[in-house]
Amino acid sequence: GSAMITPRFDGGGPHTPFGASRGGELGVRAWAVPGLLQSSAPRPMGPVEIRFVGSGDAFGSRGRFQTCIAVRSPDDFFLIDCGASSLVALRQQGIEPREVSKVFLTHLHGDHFGGLPFLLLDGQYASKRTEPITIVGPPGLEERLTQAREVLFPGSSKVTPNFDIRLVEIKPRAPITVDDVVVTAFPAAHFSGAPSYSLRVETAGKTFVYSGDTQWTDTLLEASADADLFACECYVFDKDVPLHNSYARIMENRSRMTCKRLIVTHMNEDMLSRVGEIELEAAEDGKTVIL
């Protein structure tokens, strides 16, 4: 059945109740409304550490891990995307998977969300997680995540975990607040069987934007406006490839961007072979930026 619950987060203050249904395979489902899961406690400002845990494409070009960006503020730790290789990448870089409080997903392709079945399984059996995890993504998240879990580990989505799994499906240009992270989704030009997004994430007074996978679209200018850091996918050097961005397109539009810092990521083999000749800062696995 359905129940109104008042989630308690680490702030301990009053929180906005939201409608949720228990009874589904994934514990608690929340529908995004502005102000969702918002804490009233004052929060510290910065520093915010952005770590490119995985900066690679879907094919592991040059041995890079698939997309996974970790964000650490003074009192929180969460991921943006969690590609299939992310659990290995986190452990290799000395990060405890059970520390992850939230995962924000740009889109539902395996190199961006395929690590979730492993992260959730780890929480149940290896890390012995007890704290809730909130997963935020596009419409279709609940169905696709359940399918992925069942294909990889049959029965895993039906086991009642020792921790709450909270799913939040978000819509474009409708900012929501989860704990004290404000996230806004912008439409991306990328087919993934569900809406694909660029994500603007504001936490501890800093703004980080990740393009997700997308062809060049001027929406990227809107999404990244005045951001402290904009991580932009740069799959190819100068070809026009459907669904993906290129270094040439980014450079054509660089002067129109108002972000304070730009880093390119999600590069294919050809792009990586030319990374020494580009005029932009490039991500690599383990690269850390302090905002």
Language model segments and positions:
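Binuclear metal-dependent hydrolase catalytic cores
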Residues: 3-5, 17, 30, 36-209, ...
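Residue-level detector of intrinsically disordered/flexible regions characterized by low predicted structural confidence
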Residues: 7, 27, 40, 212, ...
